[in-house]
Protein backbone atom coordinates (compact mmCIF):
# COMPACT_ATOMS: atom_id res chain seq x y z
CA UNK A 1 0.00 0.00 0.00
CA UNK A 2 1.30 3.44 -0.97
CA UNK A 3 1.02 5.98 1.82
CA UNK A 4 -0.05 9.26 0.24
CA UNK A 5 -1.14 11.21 3.29
CA UNK A 6 -0.96 11.46 7.06
CA UNK A 7 -4.42 9.83 7.08
CA UNK A 8 -3.04 6.75 5.31
CA UNK A 9 -0.20 6.57 7.84
CA UNK A 10 -2.65 6.82 10.74
CA UNK A 11 -4.81 4.07 9.22
CA UNK A 12 -1.84 1.69 9.11
CA UNK A 13 -0.88 2.63 12.65
CA UNK A 14 -4.36 1.82 13.91
CA UNK A 15 -4.34 -1.51 12.10
CA UNK A 16 -0.89 -2.46 13.37
CA UNK A 17 -1.48 -1.26 16.93
CA UNK A 18 -3.67 -4.30 17.56
CA UNK A 19 -0.72 -6.60 16.86
CA UNK A 20 1.46 -4.65 19.29
CA UNK A 21 -1.18 -4.02 21.95
CA UNK A 22 -0.34 -7.17 23.90
CA UNK A 23 3.33 -6.17 24.06
CA UNK A 24 2.53 -2.54 24.90
CA UNK A 25 0.19 -3.52 27.74
CA UNK A 26 2.58 -6.07 29.24
CA UNK A 27 5.43 -3.58 28.98
CA UNK A 28 3.55 -1.22 31.31
CA UNK A 29 2.85 -3.73 34.06
CA UNK A 30 4.81 -5.97 36.38
CA UNK A 31 3.17 -9.28 37.24
CA UNK A 32 4.15 -12.45 39.03
CA UNK A 33 1.33 -14.34 37.36
CA UNK A 34 2.18 -16.84 34.64
CA UNK A 35 -0.23 -16.94 31.72
CA UNK A 36 -0.93 -20.04 29.65
CA UNK A 37 -3.77 -21.41 27.58
CA UNK A 38 -4.78 -23.60 30.52
CA UNK A 39 -5.11 -20.54 32.77
CA UNK A 40 -7.39 -18.72 30.36
CA UNK A 41 -4.97 -16.78 28.14
CA UNK A 42 -6.55 -16.13 24.75
CA UNK A 43 -3.43 -15.16 22.83
CA UNK A 44 0.28 -15.36 23.57
CA UNK A 45 3.37 -14.04 21.83
CA UNK A 46 6.87 -15.49 22.02
CA UNK A 47 9.60 -12.94 21.31
CA UNK A 48 12.96 -14.37 20.31
CA UNK A 49 16.18 -12.38 20.03
CA UNK A 50 17.23 -12.30 16.40
CA UNK A 51 20.46 -10.36 16.87
CA UNK A 52 23.81 -11.62 15.62
CA UNK A 53 24.93 -12.91 19.03
CA UNK A 54 21.82 -14.98 19.70
CA UNK A 55 21.65 -16.20 16.11
CA UNK A 56 25.20 -17.49 16.53
CA UNK A 57 23.91 -19.42 19.56
CA UNK A 58 21.11 -21.13 17.57
CA UNK A 59 18.18 -18.78 18.17
CA UNK A 60 16.92 -19.72 14.70
CA UNK A 61 16.85 -23.34 15.83
CA UNK A 62 14.75 -22.28 18.83
CA UNK A 63 12.32 -20.52 16.49
CA UNK A 64 12.04 -23.54 14.20
CA UNK A 65 11.43 -25.93 17.10
CA UNK A 66 8.85 -23.63 18.69
CA UNK A 67 6.91 -23.46 15.43
CA UNK A 68 7.01 -27.25 15.13
CA UNK A 69 5.72 -27.68 18.68
CA UNK A 70 2.97 -25.09 18.12
CA UNK A 71 1.85 -26.88 14.96
CA UNK A 72 2.01 -30.27 16.68
CA UNK A 73 -0.27 -29.02 19.46
CA UNK A 74 -2.63 -27.32 16.98
CA UNK A 75 -2.43 -23.90 18.64
CA UNK A 76 -1.20 -21.84 15.68
CA UNK A 77 -4.20 -19.51 16.00
CA UNK A 78 -3.39 -18.71 19.63
CA UNK A 79 0.40 -18.39 19.71
CA UNK A 80 2.72 -16.15 17.65
CA UNK A 81 6.49 -16.51 17.38
CA UNK A 82 8.14 -13.16 16.59
CA UNK A 83 11.80 -12.46 15.87
CA UNK A 84 12.89 -9.16 17.41
CA UNK A 85 16.15 -7.26 17.76
CA UNK A 86 18.72 -7.46 20.54
CA UNK A 87 17.38 -7.40 24.12
CA UNK A 88 20.82 -6.23 25.25
CA UNK A 89 21.52 -8.90 27.87
CA UNK A 90 23.98 -10.75 25.62
CA UNK A 91 25.64 -12.55 28.54
CA UNK A 92 22.42 -14.55 29.00
CA UNK A 93 21.45 -15.17 25.36
CA UNK A 94 19.68 -16.64 23.54
CA UNK A 95 16.75 -14.88 25.16
CA UNK A 96 13.09 -15.81 24.80
CA UNK A 97 10.37 -13.54 26.21
CA UNK A 98 6.78 -14.62 26.72
CA UNK A 99 3.98 -12.07 26.40
CA UNK A 100 1.71 -11.08 28.20
CA UNK A 101 3.40 -12.13 31.47
CA UNK A 102 6.85 -10.80 30.45
CA UNK A 103 8.60 -14.01 31.44
CA UNK A 104 12.25 -13.62 30.50
CA UNK A 105 13.96 -16.93 29.70
CA UNK A 106 17.76 -16.95 29.41
CA UNK A 107 20.34 -19.18 27.72
CA UNK A 108 17.62 -21.08 25.92
CA UNK A 109 18.56 -23.93 23.57
CA UNK A 110 16.60 -25.44 20.66
CA UNK A 111 16.00 -28.49 22.87
CA UNK A 112 14.08 -26.29 25.35
CA UNK A 113 11.47 -25.24 22.79
CA UNK A 114 9.04 -28.13 23.26
CA UNK A 115 9.15 -27.76 27.05
CA UNK A 116 8.38 -24.03 26.74
CA UNK A 117 5.28 -24.82 24.68
CA UNK A 118 4.06 -27.69 26.85
CA UNK A 119 4.82 -26.20 30.26
CA UNK A 120 4.46 -22.45 29.86
CA UNK A 121 2.33 -21.77 26.80
CA UNK A 122 -0.14 -24.60 27.34
CA UNK A 123 0.23 -25.39 31.04
CA UNK A 124 0.76 -21.88 32.40
CA UNK A 125 3.79 -22.93 34.48
CA UNK A 126 7.12 -21.11 34.35
CA UNK A 127 10.27 -23.15 33.75
CA UNK A 128 12.41 -22.24 36.74
CA UNK A 129 15.70 -23.52 35.34
CA UNK A 130 15.49 -21.08 32.40
CA UNK A 131 14.87 -18.01 34.56
CA UNK A 132 17.57 -15.49 35.39
CA UNK A 133 19.21 -16.01 38.78
CA UNK A 134 20.08 -12.80 40.62
CA UNK A 135 23.70 -13.25 41.76
CA UNK A 136 23.11 -11.08 44.86
CA UNK A 137 20.06 -12.91 46.21
CA UNK A 138 20.46 -16.21 44.32
CA UNK A 139 16.71 -16.05 43.66
CA UNK A 140 15.17 -16.48 40.22
CA UNK A 141 13.73 -13.39 38.51
CA UNK A 142 11.02 -13.83 35.90
CA UNK A 143 10.54 -10.24 34.69
CA UNK A 144 13.31 -8.07 33.23
CA UNK A 145 11.91 -5.05 35.09
CA UNK A 146 13.17 -6.62 38.32
CA UNK A 147 16.71 -7.15 36.99
CA UNK A 148 19.53 -4.80 37.99
CA UNK A 149 20.79 -4.98 34.40
CA UNK A 150 17.72 -3.10 33.14
CA UNK A 151 16.67 -1.09 36.20
CA UNK A 152 18.84 2.00 35.57
CA UNK A 153 18.66 1.91 31.80
CA UNK A 154 16.68 4.35 29.67
CA UNK A 155 16.21 3.04 26.16
CA UNK A 156 15.78 5.85 23.63
CA UNK A 157 18.04 4.92 20.72
CA UNK A 158 17.27 1.26 21.54
CA UNK A 159 13.55 1.91 22.15
CA UNK A 160 12.35 -0.59 19.53
CA UNK A 161 15.12 -3.18 19.83
CA UNK A 162 13.77 -6.33 21.45
CA UNK A 163 10.22 -5.04 21.03
CA UNK A 164 9.24 -4.98 17.35
CA UNK A 165 9.85 -7.26 14.40
CA UNK A 166 12.58 -5.32 12.55
CA UNK A 167 11.39 -6.69 9.21
CA UNK A 168 7.81 -5.47 9.66
CA UNK A 169 7.34 -1.82 8.69
CA UNK A 170 3.81 -1.75 10.11
CA UNK A 171 5.07 -2.62 13.60
CA UNK A 172 7.47 0.32 13.31
CA UNK A 173 4.60 2.59 12.20
CA UNK A 174 2.54 1.38 15.18
CA UNK A 175 5.30 2.79 17.42
CA UNK A 176 4.91 6.29 15.89
CA UNK A 177 7.27 5.38 13.08
CA UNK A 178 7.44 7.81 10.12
CA UNK A 179 5.15 10.29 11.91
CA UNK A 180 8.13 12.54 12.62
CA UNK A 181 8.90 12.56 8.90
CA UNK A 182 5.25 13.28 8.05
CA UNK A 183 5.11 16.16 10.52
CA UNK A 184 8.30 17.66 9.09
CA UNK A 185 7.14 17.42 5.48
CA UNK A 186 3.62 18.69 6.12
CA UNK A 187 4.04 21.19 8.95
CA UNK A 188 7.64 22.37 9.27
CA UNK A 189 10.21 24.22 7.22
CA UNK A 190 13.71 22.68 7.00
CA UNK A 191 15.06 25.40 9.29
CA UNK A 192 12.35 24.58 11.86
CA UNK A 193 13.52 20.97 11.98
CA UNK A 194 17.14 22.02 12.38
CA UNK A 195 16.17 24.39 15.19
CA UNK A 196 14.49 21.53 17.10
CA UNK A 197 17.58 19.33 16.78
CA UNK A 198 19.79 22.22 17.92
CA UNK A 199 17.59 22.95 20.94
CA UNK A 200 17.54 19.29 21.93
CA UNK A 201 21.30 19.41 22.53
CA UNK A 202 21.91 16.17 20.61
CA UNK A 203 25.62 15.65 19.96
CA UNK A 204 27.12 13.16 17.52
CA UNK A 205 27.41 9.69 19.01
CA UNK A 206 30.23 8.57 16.72
CA UNK A 207 33.05 9.81 18.94
CA UNK A 208 33.64 13.53 18.48
CA UNK A 209 30.42 14.76 20.05
CA UNK A 210 29.87 17.61 17.56
CA UNK A 211 26.39 19.23 17.87
CA UNK A 212 24.14 17.48 15.35
CA UNK A 213 21.85 20.43 14.68
CA UNK A 214 24.82 22.69 13.95
CA UNK A 215 26.18 20.12 11.51
CA UNK A 216 22.85 20.02 9.69
CA UNK A 217 22.71 23.83 9.64
CA UNK A 218 26.12 24.02 7.92
CA UNK A 219 24.93 21.63 5.20
CA UNK A 220 21.61 23.44 4.84
CA UNK A 221 23.33 26.76 4.15
CA UNK A 222 25.44 25.40 1.30
CA UNK A 223 24.25 26.32 -2.18
CA UNK A 224 24.39 23.29 -4.48
CA UNK A 225 22.26 21.43 -7.00
CA UNK A 226 23.09 18.12 -5.29
CA UNK A 227 23.64 17.28 -1.62
CA UNK A 228 24.11 13.95 0.14
CA UNK A 229 23.11 12.40 3.45
CA UNK A 230 25.52 9.70 4.63
CA UNK A 231 24.94 7.25 7.46
CA UNK A 232 28.25 6.11 8.92
CA UNK A 233 27.62 2.46 9.84
CA UNK A 234 31.31 1.53 9.75
CA UNK A 235 31.53 0.51 13.40
CA UNK A 236 35.04 -0.85 13.83
CA UNK A 237 36.09 -0.62 17.49
CA UNK A 238 37.08 -4.02 18.93
CA UNK A 239 34.17 -5.30 21.01
CA UNK A 240 31.73 -2.58 19.88
CA UNK A 241 28.32 -3.59 18.54
CA UNK A 242 26.03 -0.66 19.30
CA UNK A 243 25.31 0.54 15.76
CA UNK A 244 25.11 -2.96 14.37
CA UNK A 245 22.47 -3.89 16.94
CA UNK A 246 20.37 -0.80 16.15
CA UNK A 247 20.42 -1.63 12.44
CA UNK A 248 19.52 -5.24 13.19
CA UNK A 249 16.72 -4.34 15.61
CA UNK A 250 15.30 -1.04 14.34
CA UNK A 251 16.42 -0.30 10.76
CA UNK A 252 13.40 1.86 9.92
CA UNK A 253 14.47 4.47 12.48
CA UNK A 254 17.62 4.99 10.41
CA UNK A 255 15.66 5.21 7.15
CA UNK A 256 13.25 7.75 8.66
CA UNK A 257 16.04 9.84 10.20
CA UNK A 258 17.95 9.98 6.91
CA UNK A 259 14.79 11.19 5.16
CA UNK A 260 14.32 13.90 7.79
CA UNK A 261 17.95 14.94 7.41
CA UNK A 262 17.57 15.01 3.62
CA UNK A 263 14.55 17.30 3.92
CA UNK A 264 16.38 19.54 6.40
CA UNK A 265 19.52 20.10 4.33
CA UNK A 266 17.96 19.96 0.85
CA UNK A 267 19.17 16.53 -0.23
CA UNK A 268 17.42 13.86 -2.30
CA UNK A 269 20.02 11.11 -1.92
CA UNK A 270 21.09 9.05 1.06
CA UNK A 271 23.98 6.60 1.33
CA UNK A 272 24.61 4.06 4.08
CA UNK A 273 28.28 3.09 4.40
CA UNK A 274 28.44 -0.26 6.18
CA UNK A 275 31.07 -2.95 6.50
CA UNK A 276 30.43 -6.03 4.42
CA UNK A 277 31.03 -8.32 7.42
CA UNK A 278 27.69 -7.26 8.96
CA UNK A 279 25.42 -9.49 6.83
CA UNK A 280 22.43 -9.50 9.19
CA UNK A 281 22.43 -5.71 9.58
CA UNK A 282 22.75 -5.35 5.81
CA UNK A 283 19.82 -7.69 5.14
CA UNK A 284 17.59 -5.96 7.69
CA UNK A 285 18.50 -2.55 6.27
CA UNK A 286 17.85 -3.73 2.71
CA UNK A 287 14.45 -5.05 3.77
CA UNK A 288 13.60 -1.74 5.46
CA UNK A 289 14.57 0.26 2.37
CA UNK A 290 12.51 -1.99 0.08
CA UNK A 291 9.49 -1.78 2.39
CA UNK A 292 9.78 2.00 2.70
CA UNK A 293 9.77 2.28 -1.11
CA UNK A 294 6.75 -0.03 -1.39
CA UNK A 295 4.85 2.09 1.14
CA UNK A 296 5.81 5.34 -0.58
CA UNK A 297 8.04 6.51 2.28
CA UNK A 298 11.10 6.52 0.03
CA UNK A 299 11.18 7.60 -3.59
CA UNK A 300 9.36 10.40 -5.41
CA UNK A 301 6.78 12.73 -3.84
CA UNK A 302 6.87 11.24 -0.35
CA UNK A 303 3.48 11.59 1.40
CA UNK A 304 2.15 13.47 -1.62
CA UNK A 305 4.63 16.33 -1.21
CA UNK A 306 7.29 17.70 -3.56
CA UNK A 307 10.01 16.05 -1.47
CA UNK A 308 11.80 13.05 -3.00
CA UNK A 309 14.48 10.98 -1.32
CA UNK A 310 16.05 7.56 -1.79
CA UNK A 311 18.76 5.50 -0.09
CA UNK A 312 21.53 3.26 -1.37
CA UNK A 313 23.89 0.96 0.54
CA UNK A 314 27.64 1.15 -0.01
CA UNK A 315 29.96 -1.51 1.39
CA UNK A 316 33.24 -1.03 3.21
CA UNK A 317 36.04 -3.55 3.56
CA UNK A 318 36.39 -3.15 7.32
CA UNK A 319 39.10 -0.48 7.57
CA UNK A 320 38.96 1.21 10.98
CA UNK A 321 40.19 4.51 9.54
CA UNK A 322 37.08 4.68 7.35
CA UNK A 323 35.09 5.58 10.43
CA UNK A 324 36.65 9.04 9.94
CA UNK A 325 34.23 10.90 7.69
CA UNK A 326 36.63 12.10 5.00
CA UNK A 327 38.23 8.65 4.71
CA UNK A 328 34.74 7.15 4.54
CA UNK A 329 33.80 9.49 1.70
CA UNK A 330 36.94 8.58 -0.26
CA UNK A 331 36.15 4.90 0.18
CA UNK A 332 32.62 5.43 -1.16
CA UNK A 333 34.13 7.19 -4.16
CA UNK A 334 36.23 4.10 -4.91
CA UNK A 335 39.47 5.66 -3.67
CA UNK A 336 41.83 4.65 -0.89
CA UNK A 337 40.23 5.22 2.50
CA UNK A 338 42.51 8.07 3.54
CA UNK A 339 41.49 11.17 5.53
CA UNK A 340 42.10 14.69 4.30
CA UNK A 341 42.77 17.95 6.09
CA UNK A 342 39.78 20.05 7.13
CA UNK A 343 38.63 22.53 5.96
CA UNK A 344 36.92 22.01 3.64
CA UNK A 345 34.52 20.04 5.79
CA UNK A 346 32.20 17.47 4.19
CA UNK A 347 29.31 19.92 4.67
CA UNK A 348 31.10 22.15 2.14
CA UNK A 349 32.74 19.58 -0.13
CA UNK A 350 32.12 15.93 0.56
CA UNK A 351 30.97 13.00 -1.57
CA UNK A 352 31.79 13.71 -5.23
CA UNK A 353 32.70 17.25 -4.19
CA UNK A 354 29.14 18.04 -3.10
CA UNK A 355 27.88 19.18 0.34
CA UNK A 356 27.52 16.07 2.47
CA UNK A 357 26.17 15.48 5.96
CA UNK A 358 27.62 12.48 7.81
CA UNK A 359 26.03 11.08 10.98
CA UNK A 360 26.52 7.73 12.64
CA UNK A 361 23.76 5.18 13.30
CA UNK A 362 23.12 5.96 16.97
CA UNK A 363 22.91 9.70 16.29
CA UNK A 364 20.29 9.12 13.60
CA UNK A 365 18.32 6.69 15.80
CA UNK A 366 17.63 9.59 18.20
CA UNK A 367 16.20 11.91 15.54
CA UNK A 368 12.63 10.55 15.10
CA UNK A 369 11.86 10.41 18.82
CA UNK A 370 13.28 13.91 19.42
CA UNK A 371 10.93 15.25 16.76
CA UNK A 372 8.00 13.24 18.14
CA UNK A 373 8.47 14.09 21.84
CA UNK A 374 10.11 17.48 21.44
CA UNK A 375 13.47 19.14 22.01
CA UNK A 376 12.61 20.11 25.58
CA UNK A 377 11.85 16.49 26.53
CA UNK A 378 15.23 15.30 25.23
CA UNK A 379 17.09 18.23 26.79
CA UNK A 380 15.85 17.30 30.27
CA UNK A 381 17.77 14.01 30.06
CA UNK A 382 21.51 13.94 30.69
CA UNK A 383 23.92 16.65 31.83
CA UNK A 384 24.28 20.34 31.04
CA UNK A 385 26.51 19.85 27.99
CA UNK A 386 25.70 16.24 27.09
CA UNK A 387 22.00 15.65 26.55
CA UNK A 388 20.09 12.41 26.18
CA UNK A 389 21.42 8.89 26.60
CA UNK A 390 24.39 6.89 25.38
CA UNK A 391 24.52 3.28 24.22
CA UNK A 392 27.51 1.26 25.43
CA UNK A 393 28.81 -2.18 24.57
CA UNK A 394 29.76 -3.52 27.99
CA UNK A 395 32.44 -6.21 27.75
CA UNK A 396 35.46 -7.73 29.46
CA UNK A 397 35.82 -9.07 33.01
CA UNK A 398 32.28 -8.20 34.03
CA UNK A 399 29.33 -10.37 35.01
CA UNK A 400 26.74 -8.82 32.70
CA UNK A 401 28.20 -8.46 29.23
CA UNK A 402 25.82 -6.76 26.84
CA UNK A 403 24.36 -3.70 25.21
CA UNK A 404 23.16 -0.96 27.56
CA UNK A 405 21.71 2.54 27.24
CA UNK A 406 21.95 4.97 30.13
CA UNK A 407 21.29 8.69 30.64
CA UNK A 408 24.34 10.91 30.30
CA UNK A 409 25.62 11.59 33.80
CA UNK A 410 25.31 8.00 35.00
CA UNK A 411 28.53 7.14 36.83
CA UNK A 412 31.02 4.47 35.83
CA UNK A 413 30.38 2.82 39.20
CA UNK A 414 26.66 2.48 38.45
CA UNK A 415 27.38 1.01 35.03
CA UNK A 416 30.01 -1.47 36.21
CA UNK A 417 28.63 -2.56 39.58
CA UNK A 418 24.85 -2.16 39.25
CA UNK A 419 24.05 -2.68 35.57
CA UNK A 420 27.16 -4.75 34.87
CA UNK A 421 26.82 -6.82 38.03
CA UNK A 422 30.41 -6.28 39.18
CA UNK A 423 33.63 -8.07 38.34
CA UNK A 424 33.61 -11.72 37.34
CA UNK A 425 34.69 -14.24 39.94
CA UNK A 426 34.63 -11.63 42.71
CA UNK A 427 38.00 -10.31 41.59
CA UNK A 428 39.20 -6.75 42.09
CA UNK A 429 38.38 -4.04 39.57
CA UNK A 430 41.49 -2.61 37.94
CA UNK A 431 40.51 -0.39 35.02
CA UNK A 432 37.90 0.36 32.39
CA UNK A 433 38.76 1.33 28.84
CA UNK A 434 36.23 3.71 27.28
CA UNK A 435 36.32 4.88 23.70
CA UNK A 436 37.98 1.78 22.23
CA UNK A 437 41.45 2.16 20.68
CA UNK A 438 41.02 5.94 20.78
CA UNK A 439 40.19 6.10 24.47
CA UNK A 440 42.01 5.68 27.73
CA UNK A 441 42.08 3.43 30.77
CA UNK A 442 40.34 4.83 33.85
CA UNK A 443 40.95 3.53 37.36
CA UNK A 444 39.10 3.12 40.65
CA UNK A 445 39.53 6.82 41.42
CA UNK A 446 37.42 7.58 38.34
CA UNK A 447 34.51 5.27 39.20
CA UNK A 448 32.30 8.10 40.45
CA UNK A 449 32.86 10.13 37.29
CA UNK A 450 29.52 11.00 35.62
CA UNK A 451 29.71 9.72 32.05
CA UNK A 452 29.51 12.46 29.46
CA UNK A 453 31.69 13.87 26.69
CA UNK A 454 33.50 16.47 28.79
CA UNK A 455 34.03 14.44 31.97
CA UNK A 456 35.61 11.53 30.13
CA UNK A 457 37.95 13.88 28.27
CA UNK A 458 38.95 15.53 31.54
CA UNK A 459 39.67 12.12 33.04
CA UNK A 460 42.06 11.26 30.19
CA UNK A 461 39.75 9.16 28.05
CA UNK A 462 36.86 9.84 25.68
CA UNK A 463 33.33 8.73 24.88
CA UNK A 464 34.19 7.31 21.48
CA UNK A 465 31.44 5.33 19.83
CA UNK A 466 30.62 3.55 23.10
CA UNK A 467 32.90 0.61 23.72
CA UNK A 468 33.48 -0.09 27.42
CA UNK A 469 35.98 -2.82 28.33
CA UNK A 470 36.33 -3.73 32.01
CA UNK A 471 39.59 -5.18 33.36
CA UNK A 472 40.41 -6.96 36.62
CA UNK A 473 43.52 -7.60 38.71
CA UNK A 474 44.75 -10.27 36.28
CA UNK A 475 45.15 -7.82 33.40
CA UNK A 476 48.56 -6.33 32.61
CA UNK A 477 48.13 -2.68 31.68
CA UNK A 478 51.30 -2.62 29.57
CA UNK A 479 49.90 -5.51 27.54
CA UNK A 480 46.54 -3.73 27.26
CA UNK A 481 48.24 -0.63 25.86
CA UNK A 482 50.21 -2.83 23.46
CA UNK A 483 47.01 -4.60 22.31
CA UNK A 484 45.27 -1.36 21.38
CA UNK A 485 48.36 0.15 19.77
CA UNK A 486 48.93 -3.02 17.75
CA UNK A 487 45.38 -2.61 16.42
CA UNK A 488 45.94 1.06 15.57
CA UNK A 489 49.23 0.38 13.78
CA UNK A 490 47.50 -2.30 11.71
CA UNK A 491 44.59 0.01 10.87
CA UNK A 492 46.59 3.16 10.08
CA UNK A 493 46.15 4.29 6.48
CA UNK A 494 49.81 5.36 6.43
CA UNK A 495 49.19 8.78 4.93
CA UNK A 496 50.81 10.87 7.67
CA UNK A 497 54.24 10.26 9.19
CA UNK A 498 53.33 10.69 12.88
CA UNK A 499 50.77 7.90 12.70
CA UNK A 500 52.57 5.65 10.19
CA UNK A 501 56.04 5.81 11.76
CA UNK A 502 55.43 7.23 15.23
CA UNK A 503 52.97 4.55 16.29
CA UNK A 504 55.30 1.82 15.05
CA UNK A 505 58.03 3.25 17.27
CA UNK A 506 55.61 3.32 20.21
CA UNK A 507 54.71 -0.31 19.55
CA UNK A 508 58.37 -1.30 19.32
CA UNK A 509 59.00 0.29 22.72
CA UNK A 510 56.03 -1.53 24.26
CA UNK A 511 57.21 -4.84 22.79
CA UNK A 512 60.66 -4.15 24.18
CA UNK A 513 59.22 -3.48 27.64
CA UNK A 514 57.01 -6.60 27.70
CA UNK A 515 59.99 -8.71 26.58
CA UNK A 516 62.04 -7.58 29.57
CA UNK A 517 64.42 -5.39 27.54
CA UNK A 518 62.99 -1.98 28.44
CA UNK A 519 64.67 0.81 30.38
CA UNK A 520 63.39 3.74 32.42
CA UNK A 521 64.41 6.03 29.58
CA UNK A 522 61.96 4.17 27.33
CA UNK A 523 59.11 5.34 29.56
CA UNK A 524 60.10 8.97 29.01
CA UNK A 525 60.29 8.30 25.27
CA UNK A 526 56.79 6.76 25.30
CA UNK A 527 55.34 9.86 26.96
CA UNK A 528 57.16 12.35 24.72
CA UNK A 529 56.52 10.52 21.44
CA UNK A 530 52.89 9.86 22.35
CA UNK A 531 52.27 13.57 22.89
CA UNK A 532 53.99 14.47 19.60
CA UNK A 533 51.74 12.04 17.71
CA UNK A 534 48.64 13.51 19.39
CA UNK A 535 49.68 17.00 18.35
CA UNK A 536 50.75 16.31 14.76
CA UNK A 537 48.78 13.39 13.27
CA UNK A 538 46.42 14.16 10.40
CA UNK A 539 43.12 12.65 11.56
CA UNK A 540 41.28 11.50 14.65
CA UNK A 541 42.68 7.99 14.43
CA UNK A 542 46.27 9.18 14.65
CA UNK A 543 45.58 11.98 17.12
CA UNK A 544 43.92 9.63 19.61
CA UNK A 545 46.00 6.49 18.98
CA UNK A 546 48.50 7.19 21.83
CA UNK A 547 45.68 7.57 24.39
CA UNK A 548 45.84 3.98 25.72
CA UNK A 549 49.61 4.35 26.18
CA UNK A 550 49.49 7.79 27.79
CA UNK A 551 46.57 6.96 30.09
CA UNK A 552 48.16 3.73 31.33
CA UNK A 553 51.45 5.58 31.88
CA UNK A 554 49.60 8.17 33.96
CA UNK A 555 47.53 5.72 35.99
CA UNK A 556 49.79 2.65 36.17
CA UNK A 557 53.32 4.06 36.12
CA UNK A 558 54.38 1.69 38.91
CA UNK A 559 53.40 -1.26 36.72
CA UNK A 560 55.56 0.04 33.88
CA UNK A 561 58.43 0.49 36.35
CA UNK A 562 58.11 -3.13 37.48
CA UNK A 563 58.48 -4.21 33.85
CA UNK A 564 61.58 -2.12 33.13
CA UNK A 565 63.33 -2.09 36.52
CA UNK A 566 62.36 -5.36 38.19
CA UNK A 567 61.71 -7.31 34.96
CA UNK A 568 58.48 -8.70 36.40
CA UNK A 569 54.83 -8.68 35.36
CA UNK A 570 52.53 -8.79 38.39
CA UNK A 571 49.65 -10.09 36.25
CA UNK A 572 51.80 -12.85 34.73
CA UNK A 573 50.67 -11.87 31.23
CA UNK A 574 54.06 -11.01 29.71
CA UNK A 575 55.59 -14.41 28.92
CA UNK A 576 59.13 -13.15 28.55
CA UNK A 577 59.07 -11.92 32.15
CA UNK A 578 57.89 -15.22 33.61
CA UNK A 579 60.02 -17.88 35.24
CA UNK A 580 58.82 -21.50 35.26
CA UNK A 581 59.99 -23.79 38.06
CA UNK A 582 58.94 -27.16 39.45
CA UNK A 583 57.97 -27.63 43.09
CA UNK A 584 60.06 -30.53 44.48
CA UNK A 585 57.38 -31.14 47.13
CA UNK A 586 54.59 -31.62 44.57
CA UNK A 587 56.49 -33.28 41.71
CA UNK A 588 56.22 -37.11 41.77
CA UNK A 589 58.54 -37.62 38.79
CA UNK A 590 55.87 -38.86 36.36
CA UNK A 591 57.94 -37.41 33.49
CA UNK A 592 54.78 -36.18 31.69
CA UNK A 593 56.00 -32.58 31.61
CA UNK A 594 59.36 -33.60 30.13
CA UNK A 595 57.69 -35.67 27.42
CA UNK A 596 55.58 -32.69 26.33
CA UNK A 597 58.24 -29.95 26.56
CA UNK A 598 58.98 -28.82 22.97
CA UNK A 599 62.35 -27.34 24.01
CA UNK A 600 63.69 -30.33 26.01
CA UNK A 601 64.12 -27.92 28.91
CA UNK A 602 62.94 -30.38 31.61
CA UNK A 603 65.11 -33.12 33.05
CA UNK A 604 64.93 -35.57 35.93
CA UNK A 605 64.76 -39.24 36.84
CA UNK A 606 61.47 -41.12 36.93
CA UNK A 607 59.82 -40.89 40.38
CA UNK A 608 62.22 -38.07 41.31
CA UNK A 609 61.53 -34.30 41.27
CA UNK A 610 62.28 -32.73 37.88
CA UNK A 611 63.85 -29.36 37.09
CA UNK A 612 63.46 -26.77 34.32
CA UNK A 613 66.56 -25.30 32.66
CA UNK A 614 65.82 -21.54 32.51
CA UNK A 615 68.15 -20.98 29.54
CA UNK A 616 66.23 -23.54 27.46
CA UNK A 617 62.67 -22.75 28.62
CA UNK A 618 60.61 -20.98 25.95
CA UNK A 619 57.80 -20.27 28.42
CA UNK A 620 55.11 -21.90 26.33
CA UNK A 621 53.19 -23.20 29.35
CA UNK A 622 52.88 -26.74 27.98
CA UNK A 623 54.31 -28.24 31.17
CA UNK A 624 51.73 -26.46 33.31
CA UNK A 625 48.92 -27.61 31.02
CA UNK A 626 50.03 -31.26 31.26
CA UNK A 627 50.93 -31.48 34.95
CA UNK A 628 48.20 -33.18 37.00
CA UNK A 629 49.70 -32.31 40.38
CA UNK A 630 49.98 -28.47 40.18
CA UNK A 631 53.74 -28.82 40.50
CA UNK A 632 54.60 -26.15 37.91
CA UNK A 633 55.11 -22.74 39.50
CA UNK A 634 55.17 -19.42 37.64
CA UNK A 635 56.64 -16.23 39.03
Segments and roles (model prediction):
Residues 182-223, 378-380, 385, 393, ...:
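Accessory "access/gating" subregions that flank catalytic or transport cores
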Residues 50-58, 197-219, 318-330, 336, ...:
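Conserved phosphate/anionic-ligand binding catalytic regions in large, soluble enzymes, centered on
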Residues 92-96, 498-504, 592-609, 622-635:
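Iron-sulfur cluster-binding cysteine motifs and their immediate structural context
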Residues 149-153, 282-408, 420:
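Hydrophobic alpha-helical positions that pack around
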Residues 15-44, 59-83, 100-132, 180-197, ...:
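Ferredoxin-type iron-sulfur electron-transfer modules in oxidoreductases and energy-metabolism complexes
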Residues 388-400, 406-408, 412, 570-618, ...:
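C-terminal accessory/binding modules appended to enzymatic or scaffolding proteins
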Residues 27, 131-199, 352, 359-374:
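Flexible inter-domain linker/hinge segments
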Residues 70, 257-259, 409-424:
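Short amphipathic, charge-patterned alpha-helical segments
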Amino acid sequence: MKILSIHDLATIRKRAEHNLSLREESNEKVTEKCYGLASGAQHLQILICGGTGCKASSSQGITDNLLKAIKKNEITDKVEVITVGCFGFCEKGPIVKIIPDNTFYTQVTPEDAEEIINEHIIGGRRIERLLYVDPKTEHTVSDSKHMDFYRKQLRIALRNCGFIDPENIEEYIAREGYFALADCLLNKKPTDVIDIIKRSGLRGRGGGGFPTGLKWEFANKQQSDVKYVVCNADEGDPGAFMDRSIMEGDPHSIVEAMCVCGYSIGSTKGLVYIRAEYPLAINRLKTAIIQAREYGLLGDHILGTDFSFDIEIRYGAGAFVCGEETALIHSMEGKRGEPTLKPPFPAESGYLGKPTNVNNVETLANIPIILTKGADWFATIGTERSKGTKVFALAGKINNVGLIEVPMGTTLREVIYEIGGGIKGGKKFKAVQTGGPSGGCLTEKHLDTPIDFDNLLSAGSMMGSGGMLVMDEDDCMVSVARFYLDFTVEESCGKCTPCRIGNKRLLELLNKITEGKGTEKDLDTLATLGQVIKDTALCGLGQTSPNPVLSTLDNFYDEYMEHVRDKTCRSKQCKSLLTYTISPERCIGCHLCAKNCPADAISGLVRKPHVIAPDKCIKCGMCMARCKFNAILVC
